[in-house]
Amino acid sequence: MVTCLTTFAVLLLTAAVASAAEAAAPGGESYVKAIFAVGAMIGAGIAIGVGAVGAGLGIGTAASGACQAVGRNPGVQGKIMMTMLVGMAMAESIAIYALVVSLVLIFANPYTKFFFVG
């Protein structure tokens, strides 16, 4: 999941450059729209990238701790596994929230009305 989200972040940054080239036409307002679109897409890429890194660190820490605990006391493997899976789900939720924020920034940006009147 983390690799998929990191790939998505790279694609968002690539799409920002393509959108800027497509939207840039002679005229002042089109440049403002292009800069706004590029800023939103770069922000979305950064959000998903940081969210994926945070999730990766959280999942790695949870798995490391669980492996050490099972190595020390193999009798409680079931309880440790359940706790580890809950912790991994919470860590992965950060990446999912970052994905939602990036999709909102790209497709349903609430700040568009402040920059474009008319």
Swiss-Prot record:
Subcellular location: Cell inner membrane
InterPro entries for this protein: ATP_synth_csu_bac/chlpt (IPR005953), ATP_synth_F0_csu (IPR000454), ATP_synth_F0_csu_DDCD_BS (IPR020537), ATP_synth_F0_csu_sf (IPR038662), ATPase_proteolipid_c-like_dom (IPR002379), F/V-ATP_Csub_sf (IPR035921)
Organism listed in the record: Syntrophus aciditrophicus (strain SB)
Membrane-topology descriptor: Multi-pass membrane protein
Site (Reversibly protonated during proton transport) residue list: 92
Name of the protein this chain belongs to: ATP synthase subunit c
Molecular function terms, GO-annotated: lipid binding; proton-transporting ATP synthase activity, rotational mechanism
Primary localisation category: membrane
Chain ranges passing through the membrane: 34-54, 88-108
Record-stated family: Belongs to the ATPase C chain family.
Keywords of this entry: ATP synthesis, Cell inner membrane, Cell membrane, CF(0), Hydrogen ion transport, Ion transport, Lipid-binding, Membrane, Transmembrane, Transmembrane helix, Transport
Function in brief: F(1)F(0) ATP synthase produces ATP from ADP in the presence of a proton or sodium gradient. F-type ATPases consist of two structural domains, F(1) containing the extramembraneous catalytic core and F(0) containing the membrane proton channel, linked together by a central stalk and a peripheral stalk. During catalysis, ATP synthesis in the catalytic domain of F(1) is coupled via a rotary mechanism of the central stalk subunits to proton translocation.
Assembly notes: F-type ATPases have 2 components, F(1) - the catalytic core - and F(0) - the membrane proton channel. F(1) has five subunits: alpha(3), beta(3), gamma(1), delta(1), epsilon(1). F(0) has three main subunits: a(1), b(2) and c(10-14). The alpha and beta chains form an alternating ring which encloses part of the gamma chain. F(1) is attached to F(0) by a central stalk formed by the gamma and epsilon chains, while a peripheral stalk is formed by the delta and b chains.
GO annotation, cellular component aspect: plasma membrane; proton-transporting ATP synthase complex; proton-transporting two-sector ATPase complex, proton-transporting domain
CDD domains, A to Z: ATP-synt_Fo_c
